[in-house]
Amino acid sequence: MSLHAQLSPEAEARLQAQKRSSVITSVMIALLIMALVILTLLFILLPNLLIKSPTIVAYQAGAPEEENMDQKEVNPQVQRKPSAPSSSMAKVIASSTPSPTAVPVPETEAEPNLDFGSGDDFGQGWGNGGDGGGGGFGNIPATMRKRCSPEDRLQRLKENGGNEKCEEAVVKALRYFKETQAGDGSWGGSTKVAYTALVLLAYLGHCETPLSVEFGVTVTGAITFLVDNCQKNKGRMASNLQDKHWCYSHAIAAYAIAEAYTFCNQLSINLPNLKESVQSSVQWIIDNQNQSGGWEYSYDEAGDRGGDMSITAWQMQALKAGKHTGLEFRNMTRCIRDALKYCETCQAADGGFGYVGTTALGDGHSTLVGAGTLCFQQHKGAANSNARKGMKYIDKKSQFDYNAGPCNLYEHYYSSQAAINNGGKSWAQYNQMFRDQLLNAQNNDGSWPAPPQPGPAARNDPVYVTALATLMLEVYYRFLPGTAAGK
């Protein structure tokens, strides 16, 4: 007999119905819970799904450079801001240890005002350059910033007597340089450092940097060549240090890499050893000034000749570019003060500047009047009496004839800057004299032929001539004279 009671059919039916009801209830509860979970997830995730995900741009910061007292080779990587266009990698820079860092010597003398003042029509129609350069150039010195926008360049050209042909001629010249650059980044034969620096200045005058789409590789190669030379020569820059004229190469190259550093620093472009080369090369100029206040061949500090105006003018341009970098240099103020005193001794009563003392070279025409005038404009302002006297000489005696001569481009490289810095009638007269002649003389390949009667120490190399001509045509926008530039 079974120990369990047998359920009646009715009880069995009710039990089965109860089981089915429990299963259905459990399933419904599970479905409701799942639905609630899904709704909760949708509530959380749906807003993010409806918003377009932003584009994430990442870049790798450059590792800090380590000091190494041994000879080494560096494969420079150009780092830049995320928004910048791509550029080529720099060439290999062989670096060597620069001269030991000296302890800074504090200057206790009061620093004179080295900015431009207001001169005769100085800066008329130029604006103040303080409206922001855009495109990452906002912290570039205002005097240099306007060259970096095509619109600003054309505006400067239009407002100051230039035209679109000037811009076209400059671009043709830059393309000529691109085609003729050597594999090591240089131009020129026995004077590679000086010529490469002049060409680099022409590129920078058009705001071409290592990030430039068309000329970035060319510019990077030129900077790399000069930095490599500086590192190998422990702060000195020249093709031949045994040639007494190397003081020219050094100053022009220091000028060029200082200006390059100003752009690269603002654009977060890290070219190895560029900063160090700027510091050592500009400091060399300061530390090797002649006792006269000028600069001499081979940087002879004690030579009785005391230097000359031609050498000195390039050193002064390099010092101005060095100040624009924002880097620290020992005794810069005292150096510039003494140099300006030297320049005063070279100015004749008629306003011209001699080569050594007040004596001009050749036929007596002051081919260095623009150089001397520019030195005072850069470091004292166009209102300075020496600068005014120099401009009066330029107004009366400048000659520019590209077909028959005289046409000393070395003289006019300086005079074109001095004239536009002064502005007014002086610039209008000078611009009318040179602009169209220079444009019409350009060769189809973008170069310029050597002009007749080019003056003392004439050089007929097409790279040299083309670099000077290009810098003259960039004078409309290369610097803003109303805010203390001009180089």
Where are these regions (language model features)?
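Strand-loop microenvironment adjacent to phosphate/nucleotide-handling motifs in alpha/beta enzyme folds
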Residues: 1-2, 35
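Intrinsic-disorder/low-complexity signature in envelope-associated proteins
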Residues: 2, 6, 10-12, 45-167, ...
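Membrane interfacial helix-start segments of signal peptides and signal-anchor transmembrane helices
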Residues: 16-39
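Short hydrophobic/aromatic segments of transmembrane alpha-helices and their interfaces
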Residues: 18-22, 51-52, 169-171
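Alpha-helical architecture
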Residues: 28-32, 306, 443
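An alpha-helical repeat/solenoid feature that recognizes helix-turn-helix modules
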Residues: 133-172, 186-218, 231-436, 447-485
